[in-house]
A protein has these predicted regions:
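Adenylate-forming
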Residues: 123-127
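PAPS-dependent sulfotransferase catalytic core
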Residues: 1-116, 121-122, 139, 143-145, ...
């Protein structure tokens, strides 16, 4: 299990990774997850800002998020491991209503140990409207951003 601070205080991510579909965000997320100074949530995509600013996402995101939690549970079972109690509590809290509030978003990164950089990898942030981009800038003024892009033709072919 990754480093985990069960007593951690709610905090904001220090790094945000966004990008187009098939641009490599999953690969980069998994690579950064291996770095001892980067902390990632047990699920890749947090979806906070698009839940708040993309009405077309709002209906599906609670289900999608709960499914990501079930996938995390399946990964533990597949490895023959029991999920630690503190992670179970965390996942229950993350899937309880109300979701996608500022408090909820900060709580998503609370288990990140001191000295690590919490990472939010949500490619869909690249589709935010102007109001969403403004909220990101206001809410995360010190965050560093990674925007992955890919040749559009190669990306389209990879989706076939």
């Amino acid at each position: 299990m990754r480093a985990w601070d069960a007593e951690g205080k709610p905090r904001k991510p220090r790094v945000v990774c966004i990008g187009a579909q098939k641009a490599g965000t999953s690969w980069l997320h998994h690579q950064l997850n291996e770095h001892p100074k980067i902390w990632t949530t047990p699920f890749k995509e947090v979806h906070y800002f698009n839940a708040r600013h993309c009405p077309e996402h709002q209906q599906l995101l609670p289900w999608h998020f709960r499914e990501a939690v079930r996938a995390t549970e399946r990964r533990f079972r597949a490895r023959g491991e029991e999920m630690p109690d503190e992670m179970v509590r965390y996942l229950v809290e993350m899937t309880a209503d109300p979701m996608f509030t500022p408090k909820w978003y900060r709580q998503a990164f609370a288990p990140a140990p001191r000295g690590t950089l919490p990472l939010d990898t949500t490619p869909e942030y690249s589709t935010l409207p102007d109001a969403g981009v403004d909220e990101v800038a206001d809410f995360l003024p010190r965050a560093k951003f990674i925007y992955l892009i890919r040749d559009p033709v190669a990306r389209a072919i990879s989706q076939l």
